[in-house]
Amino acid sequence: MYEVLQYIDGKLTPGTPGRSQDINDPARGEMIGRVRLASREDVDAAVAAAQRAFPGWAATPPLRRSRILNRFRALLEEHAEELAATITSEHGKVHADALGEVQRGLEVVEFAVGIPHLLKGEVTENVGTSVDSHSLRQPLGVVAGITPFNFPI
């Protein structure tokens, strides 16, 4: 049996005691692990860590960001079989479908690698008499998203 911890401020943490949920293998009907659930304090700690990291990430050049995402993509690819096996045991998907989910996750990361190119500002000359338009894209701060957990990976 394994335990899924929270990753906050660069380290794995068990979070608030007593808040967890079983992970069950639907094919065998048995518990295979536990996932720690976040409390309000855990979320506050994660947001505070992200706010502390924000200035450094905002100053990171787009090429460096792409390299970091490429490394993440390489790790997903390297561990594709292991990830697919986890999806199969936790969700009951057949292995081929689970591998497809990992592949779709890889495609999303590959798309994200190219996003820094879209972060460039624009200059449009003569939008009006003696008027030029300049746009500059800058990170604004920490955001959070509550997203579907089940696809892709």
Locations of regions flagged by a protein language model:
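Secondary-structure boundary/capping motif
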Residues: 15, 97, 152-153
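Hydrophobic face of amphipathic alpha-helices that form TPR/SEL1-like repeat modules
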Residues: 1-28
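A short local loop/turn or secondary-structure capping micro-motif enriched for an aromatic residue
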Residues: 22-23, 40-43, 153
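Glycine-rich loop-to-alpha-helix module at the N-terminal edge of alpha/beta enzyme cores
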Residues: 32-119, 130
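Short glycine-rich loop/turn motifs that provide flexible caps or phosphate-binding loops at active sites
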Residues: 9, 17, 32, 91, ...
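Conserved strand-loop elements at the edges of beta-sheets that form or border functional pockets
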Residues: 25, 37, 137
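Residue-level signature of catalytic and energy-coupling elements of molecular machines
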Residues: 10, 29, 65, 109, ...
